């Protein structure tokens, strides 16, 4: 797993959140009535109409070269270490999604040994991706929620007392 792949995944998350925000703003702006002297962006009448709920999107990332600093080898240094795997889906944007998988059921102590009295659990983040839909000769994209495991953490185990 490279830092570049992690950076691209993070950038795609932010892009999808921005798309959702823009779609929401478009919807709320359409419902507002401008006050006297106030104007909202209005599409020229010569422009073709766009179907309700659709949005034109350029998938290029404006600041793609901007780097987000990442901690070095955090997945190996954690008391709950994990490995990365890449899932691939050609009908999803992004087509590559990086997932973390916990290495142990227990946590790693200061001596590097697994402590089975603690639990290693996944940290999950719900994110939005674009799902490609084929309709005859045309292709469209629809937002889809995806649960991504981004790392693991060490927790005290749940203890159930039987009475």
Swiss-Prot record:
It comes from the Eukaryota. InterPro entries: Cystine-knot_cytokine (IPR029034), IL-17_chr (IPR020440), IL-17_fam (IPR010345). The keyword Ribosomal protein does not apply. Residues 1-30 form the signal peptide. The keyword Disulfide bond applies. Disulfide bonds join 102-152, 107-154. One of its GO terms (molecular function) is cytokine activity. Homodimer; disulfide-linked. Heterodimer with IL17A (IL17A-IL17F). Forms complexes with IL17RA and IL17RC receptors with 2:1 binding stoichiometry: two receptor chains for one interleukin molecule. IL17F homodimer forms predominantly complexes with IL17RC homodimer, whereas IL17A-IL17F favors complexes with IL17RA-IL17RC. IL17RA and IL17RC chains cannot distinguish between IL17A and IL17F molecules, potentially enabling the formation of topologically distinct complexes. This is Interleukin-17F. It comes from Callithrix jacchus (White-tufted-ear marmoset).
